[in-house]
Amino acid sequence: MEKIKVSISWSGDNYCANAQGDYLNGIIAATHKTLEGVKQEFQSALQFHIEGCLEDGDKFPEWITDDNYELEYITEVSALLHSLDGILTRSSIARVSGINERQIGHYASGHRTPRPQQREKIINGIHKISRDLAMVM
C-alpha cells in the first residue's frame, strides 16, 4: 500500500495540513482548530481534489484512483507542542529536553523551526514525561 505523506504544522490560529507531489497533480491543503479536525478536513480536501481532477480528465496513478493508499501524518514540532498546551507546560518540556523555555515557545508558535537534533530532544523529553506519568499509580 502506498503512502501519502501529510505535513501538519501550527500557524497562527490553526493546524495546517498539506501534501504535494507529482502523483497528486498539485498541492492539497486544509486547516482546522484541532489536530483531529485538520486530519478529517485534509481527507475531505484530498477526496474533493481527486474527484475534481478526474472530472477534468487529469490522470492519477492507479493506486490513488483505487484508494490503495494510506495517509502518513508527519507532525511538525509546532503542532506537537501546541497540541500539548494545557497538558504539559513549556517549562516542564524545557527542563527535560535541556532546551530554553523561550526557545520552546518559538518552536510552539511556528516562528522558529528546530534542527533535527533539537526536535529529537523535545520528543525524547515528552516521552520521558509520559513514562514518568505512567509510573504513577
Residues of each region from the PLM?
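Short, charged, surface-exposed hinge/linker loops at domain edges
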Residues: 3, 44-102, 106-108, 112-119, ...
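DNA-contacting interfaces and partner/effector-binding or oligomerization modules
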Residues: 1-58, 62
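Proteins with a high burden of low-complexity, intrinsically disordered sequence enriched in S/T/G/P/A and R
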Residues: 19-20, 86-88, 128
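Residue cluster at the C-terminal edge of the helix-turn-helix DNA-binding motif
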Residues: 125, 129-132
